[in-house]
Amino acid sequence: MRCPKCQSLKSSVIDSRQAEDGNTIRRRRSCDQCGQRFTTYERIEEKTLVVVKKDGTREQFSREKIFNGIIRSAQKRPVSTDDIDEVVNRIEQKVRAQGDSEIESDVIGNLVMEELVELDEITYVRFASVYRSFKDVGELENLLKQMISKGSKVKPGKKDETK
């Protein structure tokens, strides 16, 4: 593993443990040349997954793109990056469990919305307003009315513990 400080390819593993998600190994390393300590993560190489967008174009699945979209929606909300990472892990697991090499972007968007409504309703509304491309305030108002009629199940920033 290349040292981020001196670029040496020689390093020693100091500590190795399984990450919380169970699919990743976290390794603490020390560069044999300069002594710099750094962390690496090892995960199973998944088969390539292609997302089919609304306009028919295709691009490689990116968990970072989902993570960044949720981060933007959760700005100034009591939602931790660990919570968001857990959401992205669950979404990726559901997408890969389908076993297909291609998935529609709408399916991913709906999975994100299912997760966000349980995590934080404001984050959900922010994400939905961009994802669904609301054309006016009336469409947003309809979404809010639907949420109110279903009853608020969660408190902001908390997961629903009743499930």
Curated annotation (Swiss-Prot):
Pfam families: ATP-cone, Zn_ribbon_NrdR. It comes from the Bacteria. Residues 1-22 are annotated as: Disordered. Keywords: ATP-binding, DNA-binding, Metal-binding, Nucleotide-binding, Repressor, Transcription, Transcription regulation, Zinc, Zinc-finger. GO terms for biological process: negative regulation of DNA-templated transcription. Transmembrane segments: none annotated. A zinc finger (unnamed) spans 3-34. Its cofactor is Zn(2+). Residues 49-139 form the ATP-cone domain. Coiled coil: none annotated. The keyword Zinc applies. InterPro entries: ATP-cone_dom, NrdR-like_N, RNR_NrdR-like. One of its GO terms (molecular function) is zinc ion binding. Binds 1 zinc ion. Belongs to the NrdR family. Negatively regulates transcription of bacterial ribonucleotide reductase nrd genes and operons by binding to NrdR-boxes. NCBIfam families: transcriptional regulator NrdR. This is Transcriptional repressor NrdR. It comes from Streptococcus suis (strain 05ZYH33). The lineage of its organism: Bacteria, Bacillati, Bacillota, Bacilli, Lactobacillales. The gene is nrdR.
